[in-house]
Amino acid sequence: MAEIEELNDQMKVRREKMGNLHDAGIDPFGHKFTRTHNSQELHEAYDEKTKEELHELALSGIVAGRLMTKRGKGKVGFAHLQDREGQIQLYVRKDEVGEENYEIFKKADLGDFLGVEGEIMKTDMGELSIKAKKLTFLSKALRPLPEKFHGLTDTETRYRKRYLDLISNKESFNRFVTRSKIISEIRRYMDGRGYLEVETPVLNNEAGGASARPFYTHHNSLDIDMALRIATELHLKRLIVGGMEKVYELGRVFRNEGMDMTHNPEFTTMESYEAYADFEDIMDLTEGIFQHVAKTVVGQDVLEYDGKEINVGGKFKRVHMVDAIKEVAGVDFWPEMTFEEATALAKEHDIHVEKHFTSVGHIINEFFEKYVEETLIQPTFVFGHPKEISPLAKMNEKDPRFTDRFELFINGKEYANAFSELNDPIDQLERFEAQAKAKELGDDEATGVDYDYVEALEHGMPPTGGLGIGIDRLVMLFTGTTSIRDVLLFPTMK
């Protein structure tokens, strides 16, 4: 628990007011309170009514929320209560609520929670309000709101104390509401296509399913080291072996790697697997997910993002990795070449060759990352990744140097990774062993051998198309946000 700091004057006054409430027989931390309306329901129902129409209707309502503004003196006061949907004004008169209730109002501080019952009305200025008949104290805020309660400007505080950001910054609040809606719509889309949502282990004996550095922990009772999952892939494909045919999982994965504007150590992915499908079917599925979210959540195909217009409508561009490199960098990897020839090309083009690079495929990937990625602004499926960097993908039938894999790039960043899954257990074991060798040579993103998964494949897995989407980046795109910390309620902080 954080150390309790010395109370400042405001905090002392608030504690005194809490004591005064106790002395008056009022619980400063109240109990259940039943509302008839939230602020949005009131505005939607009555904003178009005139002051006279509302007076004639003589409607009453019960609202509750956090006190955000308060003004007035003498026997009349105005205030604004804030709930999840917005704000509603309060009009409080001493002769309407009585002395005891008016004292509650007068002594309430900004940040306190109140319940209010009263008449739905409009002021002379035309603002929809609740004319209070009864006030109920619901919770005392012992700390004041941030000084600029209309919006925190200190980003460090916004991330560390997200609750203050949500109270004071409606744009931030709405962004997280949008995130929830996006996730709900992805679920709706997948469920509607016959996929089963499943849950797989977060703790694993071996971290697999991706090239990434895992977090390790120790299970005391079993006395074994375990890894937090870096992907959900291998367990989901075991379910395809088991006959579930169409599965998906939305969940957290963990990678012990660097942090930047688009990377956080724990993040959310959606992975799906479909028996009897291939990577081209999964391209269609991926397009469908993005377009469904565009239609149902933001209501448009053209998104303003990072100073650019991104169009997620229609068919996404599809290009082979080798063709993309040839187009941008002018280097042609279609002709067969030796590793030495590829290394020479790399040096000519200022590409560093790592010690664990053992094939032309590694160098092709480096060319792509250095020269092509940042040029892919509009949604683009890049397919045909080299076998060496795709240990779980099926080899291409026509050219076994490459795999039936794609990545979706938007604005120079990867948004999805998918492939026709490798279902040959002998080939899979060989690729796992090659990864283990790369790990020994210093590639800390390479994985070890998952013998249990190989055994599952030996029981037979049908041809399968698999997909992984980074949910946080997807939310960034659809909310126009350039930092991943702005779409994570509680980002990792030092």
Swiss-Prot record:
Keyword terms of this UniProt record: Aminoacyl-tRNA synthetase, ATP-binding, Cytoplasm, Ligase, Magnesium, Metal-binding, Nucleotide-binding, Protein biosynthesis
Binding site for Mg(2+) 1: 407, 414
Entry's EC annotation: 6.1.1.6
Any one GO CC term of the record: cytosol
Cofactor descriptive note: Binds 3 Mg(2+) ions per subunit.
Reactions that this protein is recorded to catalyse: tRNA(Lys) + L-lysine + ATP = L-lysyl-tRNA(Lys) + AMP + diphosphate
InterPro entries on file: Aa-tRNA-synt_II, aa-tRNA-synth_II, aa-tRNA-synth_II/BPL/LPL, Lys-tRNA-ligase_II, Lys-tRNA-ligase_II_N, Lys-tRNA-synth_II_C, NA-bd_OB-fold, NA-bd_OB_tRNA
Subunit structure of this chain's protein: Homodimer.
NCBIfam families: lysS_bact, PRK00484.1
Protein name (Swiss-Prot/TrEMBL): Lysine--tRNA ligase
Organism: Lactococcus lactis subsp. cremoris (strain SK11)
Lineage: Bacteria, Bacillati, Bacillota, Bacilli, Lactobacillales
Primary gene name: lysS
